[in-house]
């Protein structure tokens, strides 16, 4: 397993533990479709959260938030729409979030990254 892949998995583990500590329940992890991948799908109360996890060793080059490009955001939005259609959840409240992890800092939960 490559080092970056291991770091990514460790970042997802940390993000999931953080979200669970905030009351979220895991529905799916690394969900794939033709449009892309959703790192974590969790339920928080009556809302489904689609979570992009970004890990960086430090804030160099803009940090974790900088790595969510407009094209990545579009892929995420399309993946979310597809997931909702495939699971007949089009009337369920949902949101696209990010959990940013930079080095040893606590995770940062950014809610509604689509604006």
Swiss-Prot record:
InterPro entries: Restrct_endonuc-II-like, tRNA_endonuc-like_dom_sf, UPF0102_YraN-like. Disulfide bonds: none annotated. Pfam families: UPF0102 (PF02021). GO terms for molecular function: nucleic acid binding. HAMAP family: UPF0102. NCBIfam families: PRK12497.1-3, YraN family protein. Belongs to the UPF0102 family. This is UPF0102 protein NMC2069.
């Amino acid at each position: 397993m490559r080092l970056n892949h291991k770091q990514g998995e460790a970042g997802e583990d940390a993000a999931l533990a953080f979200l669970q500590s905030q009351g979220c329940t895991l529905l799916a992890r690394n969900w794939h479709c033709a449009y892309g991948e959703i790192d974590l799908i969790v339920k928080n109360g009556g809302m489904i959260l689609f979570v992009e996890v970004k890990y960086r060793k430090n804030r160099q080059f803009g940090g974790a938030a900088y790595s969510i490009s407009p094209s990545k955001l579009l892929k995420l939005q399309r993946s979310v729409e597809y997931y909702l259609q495939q699971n007949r959840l089009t009337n369920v409240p949902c949101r696209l979030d990010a959990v940013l992890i930079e080095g040893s800092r606590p995770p940062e939960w950014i809610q509604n990254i689509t604006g």
